[in-house]
Amino acid sequence: METLKGSAAAGPIRTAVVGFGISGKVFHAPLIAADANYSLDVIVTADPDRASEAARLYPDARIVPTPEDLFALSGDLDLVVLGTPPLTHFDLAATAIAHGLPVVVDKPFVTTSDQGQELISRAADAGVQLTVFQNRRWDADFLTLRKLVGEAVLGEVRSFESRFEWWRPEGFGNWRDTAAVSEGGGILNDLGAHLIDQAIQLFGPVTESYGETANHSPDPGGADTEAFVSLLHESGVRSRLWMNGMAAQVGPRFHVLGSESGYTKWGLDGQEPALAAGTTPTDPGYGVEPQTDWGTFGIDGDLRPTASEPGAYPLFYAQLAAALRGKGPLPVDPEESLDVLRVIENIRAFA
């Protein structure tokens, strides 16, 4: 793969963020703006209110209404970040690649595995770097569990339970609620892209998958609002994953049982709400969980709190900068996101 040349090889990586909804505003723009490896040069949004807010928050960025305006500036850019609905990912990423621009695609990667394979092939042919924003690999709780698994203190892991549940019956009011499954909508596409990815990162490739989906929204023809997934890994571990945006009571975030011990964690990672509230990644205490939120490790009768590793979303962009300069691997191999998409497709084929 080609690496950055000229001023970007040493100076800031000139970056454009496409979309300024939850993804662009809460995640990408703050993370990029806080990293000295980057300059946030362009933000694309057609929404007047979002454009005004983007201009207020990032006065040095150029705000343009359309991707066409962005790609007209491609000679002045080094990276494109897509924080748009999944139905747009393929065309926008393909256009960025055609302009020779490295691209970050938010999850879900694309709407079909065929599209994903095509993008990977086009990027390889063009010598352009392509990655996917699987930011939940840098959640505090996931980093903690990954450390415990790596240290083998649980013994042989036999069962892994993972939940992303909350009570939000009104929905998000965006593509997550309104897009059809074929357009990347539904909770399995949205959160399954995270939870399945985490399970594979922990326990390896999947040999069997099964799932159930349900729609509890007022629209009987709408996409799923609840999903359950069961995975059998080559390692022998069984993962069971729950996703529910209408859960009046939530279960533990993680419940992991091994031959020697177990680990249980409640509550969701705090980085997203912190970023949404205006905290920046450079603020003291960013990503640090209070002791009251720590998980417990041990066996019944001998349980003890286990300090959470700091949440670290900024590492995605730090690792990406190194990769773009030829100094390390991409933070997320798009082939791994493609594997997740194939699992989701298999589940949907039989759910």
Task: Locate the predicted segments by residue.
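Rossmann-fold dehydrogenase core element
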Residues: 118-136, 156-162
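C-terminal helix-rich "cap/oligomerization" subdomain common to oxidoreductases
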Residues: 1-12, 69, 79-81, 304-306, ...
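Hydrophobic residues in well-ordered beta-strands that form the structural core
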Residues: 24, 65, 105, 111, ...
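C-terminal glycine/acidic-rich active-site capping loop/insertion
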Residues: 35, 255-335
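Predominantly a Rossmann-like dinucleotide-binding segment in NAD(P)-dependent oxidoreductases
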Residues: 136-220
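N-terminal Rossmann-like dinucleotide-binding module
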Residues: 1-58
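Beta-loop-alpha module in the N-terminal Rossmann-like domain of NAD(P)-dependent dehydrogenases
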Residues: 58-122, 312
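Contiguous beta-strand/loop segments that form the cofactor/metal-binding neighborhood of enzyme cores
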Residues: 1-5, 197-272, 314-326, 344-347
